[in-house]
Amino acid sequence: MGRYRIRVATGAWLFSGSYNRVQLWLVGTRGEAELELQLRPARGEEEEFDHDVAEDLGLLQFVRLRKHHWLVDDAWFCDRITVQGPGACAEVAFPCYRWVQGEDILSLPEGTARLPGDNALDMFQKHREKELKDRQQIYCWATWKEGLPLTIAADRKDDLPPNMRFHEEKRLDFEWTLKAGALEMALKRVYTLLSSWNCLEDFDQIFWGQKSALAEKVRQCWQDDELFSYQFLNGANPMLLRRSTSLPSRLVLPSGMEELQAQLEKELQNGSLFEADFILLDGIPANVIRGEKQYLAAPLVMLKMEPNGKLQPMVIQIQPPNPSSPTPTLFLPSDPPLAWLLAKSWVRNSDFQLHEIQYHLLNTHLVAEVIAVATMRCLPGLHPIFKFLIPHIRYTMEINTRARTQLISDGGIFDKAVSTGGGGHVQLLRRAAAQLTYCSLCPPDDLADRGLLGLPGALYAHDALRLWEIIARYVEGIVHLFYQRDDIVKGDPELQAWCREITEVGLCQAQDRGFPVSFQSQSQLCHFLTMCVFTCTAQHAAINQGQLDWYAWVPNAPCTMRMPPPTTKEDVTMATVMGSLPDVRQACLQMAISWHLSRRQPDMVPLGHHKEKYFSGPKPKAVLNQFRTDLEKLEKEITARNEQLDWPYEYLKPSCIENSVTI
């Protein structure tokens, strides 16, 4: 006879406990024991009890549990179960971290990560095969729109598997803040009913409520050329700027601009010429909002790097050449102030479109969802890469499902306020998806390709590279615990299936764009996993968090333009500028959604600080602790740097980076 001490931990979320009774079994290498005790798990509690077992169970392999219900199935969120065997046996952990529903028996394997084996009689092998078979029935792929990455098969949030849903606190906060934003928007519209909307200062009428200190600075400085240029490096969208290697063919200089031609060529030769080309927007149909046509452009901006490391704009071409306009008007800083301001506003509007659709929605949200669905379909809970990745896919499926039903859906926010809404955003997504490459998701490759390595003022680039290095060391630490040689990587069928699922299925045959279809070495696996974690954490933070700072003052990044782009400079008046920028309704909606999507989440989990313990044993824990130490060091470095800056760059401070895409 032996005495076992069992601890059952229940989640701390609302409604995690259950009034239903839970039955437990212990399963070891030598036998199985049904525990007579039945418990009613309480929210946030760890219940402990001892039980005598008549036979020697040997090494514990599984805990089985079954929730009995009478009349009502009261779901239970089980964190984990730990068991201490007779004598001096070490405590054994059985991680769960999922909802227990219905009356089926749930088997929890001991938490040691295990690679797949080829022994069909192995209980763990049978368990992982059954788990994957069940999961592949639950987590199915769907096509939201042709030509885009696949998504989870869920038309609405209630269709999602329970374990991918928001916890109750998150749901309540998300829905309450939507209502709070709508109320503030309504109050602002009422406030402006009897007011004029004729000059830029009139935007002050709605610039109250939900904003940030940085947004206030943007309001004061947004017309400055230096701040306009700064945003290409460190604003809401630092992903478009690149160093010029030649003068763009679309930049047609008319006669009389020989001096500008010489200046551009000089900067090009010095390696100090940069460009931001929005050609992806060319030909995208513009929205029609409440019967009024909106407008889009595809600008090109040429900038130079001053000796002090600051960018300055040199010329803006709002539209590319076309048969009806072979030599489009070029706008210069020396032009009449309102004409130059309107040209910059067109650039900022175009940047808003690419930022939200290409770099935010596609490159972080949709890529993260592909990683999440493939992980649930291909990697069982015992797999070390599942244990490693699962904290980084929390809430991603629900936030994306909500986006498809509220933000980019027919009649959603984009249709109501954004110039690419009404279907243009889907066409833009398709174009961007066709250009999505593996290298573009990896900062060392992307920044090198764009010629931005080593720029002293490129704060996003600096912080992204530092984080990539830290995440890469973390990945390598975990991978080398389980894959000591390249042949072990090549011989893991679950891992290889996961790779194919992402590239060939989720990303729709993306091998032509550099994504791998198999892993042949430790280093190849580590690079891919680093991309996965970076995309789901740091990159999303860099792209998401700046929305309130840079978009709350609407003239700095107008969500739509209501008049065609100017073709002459002399005719631009304040009426032209105000007639082009968003109206009161659109501006209020932009402010509300910018706050809702980029505010700090109340249940935010910082990068690397998840509480779930999926791994067992000291070695994975040591790797995670070193990761946290490295992040703390970077936090101090960024904090010290930012204290010396007029415009601190906070988005990649580790404490500001969420552990997954949750908003």
UniProtKB/Swiss-Prot annotation:
Changing E259K: Does not affect lipoxygenase activity. GO terms for biological process: arachidonate metabolic process; establishment of skin barrier; fatty acid oxidation; hepoxilin biosynthetic process; leukotriene A4 metabolic process; linoleic acid metabolic process; lipid metabolic process; lipid oxidation. It comes from the Eukaryota. Changing H355Q: No effect on arachidonate 12(S)-lipoxygenase activity. Pathway: Lipid metabolism; hydroperoxy eicosatetraenoic acid biosynthesis. Keywords: Cytoplasm, Dioxygenase, Fatty acid metabolism, Hydrolase, Iron, Lipid metabolism, Membrane, Metal-binding, Oxidoreductase, Phosphoprotein. It catalyses: (5Z,8Z,11Z,14Z)-eicosatetraenoate + O2 = (12S)-hydroperoxy-(5Z,8Z,10E,14Z)-eicosatetraenoate; (5Z,8Z,11Z,14Z)-eicosatetraenoate + O2 = (15S)-hydroperoxy-(5Z,8Z,11Z,13E)-eicosatetraenoate; 2 leukotriene A4 + O2 + 2 H2O = 2 lipoxin A4; 2 leukotriene A4 + O2 + 2 H2O = 2 lipoxin B4. InterPro entries: LipOase, LipOase_C, LipOase_C_sf, LipOase_CS, LipOase_Fe_BS, LipOase_mml, PLAT/LH2_dom, PLAT/LH2_dom_sf. Expressed in vascular smooth muscle cells. GO terms for cellular component: cytoplasm; cytosol; extracellular exosome; membrane; sarcolemma. CDD domains: PLAT_LOX. Its cofactor is Fe cation. The modification Phosphoserine is found at S246. Residues 2-114 form the PLAT domain. GO terms for molecular function: arachidonate 12(S)-lipoxygenase activity; arachidonate 15-lipoxygenase activity; hepoxilin-epoxide hydrolase activity; iron ion binding; linoleate 13S-lipoxygenase activity. PANTHER family: LIPOXYGENASE. Belongs to the lipoxygenase family. This is Polyunsaturated fatty acid lipoxygenase ALOX12. The lineage of its organism: Eukaryota, Metazoa, Chordata, Craniata, Vertebrata.
